[in-house]
Amino acid sequence: MAWGLAGLALAAAAPTVTAQLPPALGAVEVRSSAGVVVANTREAAEAGAMLLRAGGNAVDAAAAAALALGVSEPEASGLGGSVWMLIHLARGVDIFVDGSAAVPAAADPDVLEALRTAGVNVGYASVAVPGGLAAIAHAVEHYGTRPFAEVVAPAVALAENGIILPPHGLAVLENFRSRLLGSPTLTGIFLDESLVLRPADPLLCQPALARTLRVLARLGAAEFYRGEIAATMAADITANGGFVHTADLEAMRALERAPLHGRYRGFDIVASPPPGAGAAVIEALHILGRFPPERLAAADPGSRTLTLEAVRIALADLLLAVAHPPLQALLVDKGHAARRATLIRGDRALRADEIVPRPGAAAMRGSTHLSVVDAAGNAVSLSQSINHEFGAGVATPELGFPYNSSLSLFDGRDPSGPFYPRPGNLLSPTMAPMIVLRHGRPMLVIGSPGSSRIVSVVTQVIVNVVDRGMSLADAVAAPRTVWAVDGSPHAAIEVAGVGADETVAALERFGYPSVYTLCFPPRPIDLMYFGGANCAGVDPRTGDIVGVGDPRRAGWAASGDPR
């Protein structure tokens, strides 16, 4: 069933369906009248759905799911990281809650630069002040309906009773085993006495994390920033060469900032503001909006290259705007997008010097995304990160969660630069939580992990829904073509089925060198390269609330319907 431009006059909704990502993966579509929660693990999605069934709203459910991800997807999120929360309230109010990690007051630019030069991006010296829990607690207090203790309870139970990691989680553990071995605490959590992956056991229990979460449920998030937990964190971090002190934790506050707004083919786009990457998605869509929908109607080489060129331009403008904040307003200006659209050629890729990219926003790998829509029409698009897989690769034994490695993203060379580690400076992420509204209702709630590829992933799923009229399941499962700027800039494509070789050849002829090609069936660790766009939304035809988990990272959609 189509949702986009073609979806205004379509047949009635199909029952629950599975769209295939050939030849082995499927994106399962869940429909509900009571709300949906979509996250990278079943446990997290069910934790959020539990809050919906208890009478909570989308904010409560998103908070519960985010905390549960810290237990069930510890390589990508947790109490030691950052959270970015885009909220749409049914009464028509949009809010962005920024829980970015911050530079501690004692951070030494010379030390950080020496580590960066040496290629060291983990360890206690890379730990910034965690802001994620502050954002979650702020959102629950101001926009939720359930007590904070109730929101934390599912995560406590998961840590206490244990989880079974999915295949992609096991693949990440195996791939980053050496990072775990660098920390006795993380080794003890995830590896057994023979240094073999502990998830081979029936359940992975995390008793230290369970104790920490239980304290937070009883005393609230203030304990994390101003109580015994804060003191324990600061003592361990500073004793091991890090810079986070109790004063830094005490000063941490979540920030509310105005979201950005754009418009694409008659749909309203709500996005996270700079320094995040939501503005780049809006600009890419505004650029694509200068071309007729027919140019994007089919997933042929021409539509793929058009989308990639729009994303390349938008990423370059984002990086420039992050370095020069007065330019940020241009990113959502349709006149600017119209001018930039004239650069795009139909016969070849733009050269880098034609786009004029600049160094800029941080590319984050250890990240995740969840989406929620409740029965009242409230929606949350939430992204979170600990920066690298397992963050800094260190954890305090008594607390049981890995710290972020966000200080490794700052640049200590230029004191006047936007990425200089000044005290209090916030991380500039590539995360892009988004909400697409139709007549004020959340038609699509979306975001993704995936470092610099996030803008491509999110833009492409929106195009799939709006321009190609795909259902959410088909839009998420459709093979992707993305642009990556981590390392040498390059295109990457998922290929499957008839014509795959011709598609790759067409991209190379267009001027994209060294196209990274992922053929099916892939390894789970390779499939993750193309993001994890867990989506939710209201079907404009039936009014059903729909959730679709991205199969690339074992995404799961859970319903708020009574059990």
Where are these regions (language model features)?
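Extended C-terminal subregions enriched in glycine
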Residues: 376, 425, 458, 467-527
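Internal maturation/activation junctions in enzymes
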Residues: 290-385, 398-399, 406, 513-519
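N-terminal signal peptide c-region/cleavage motif recognized by signal peptidases
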Residues: 11-14
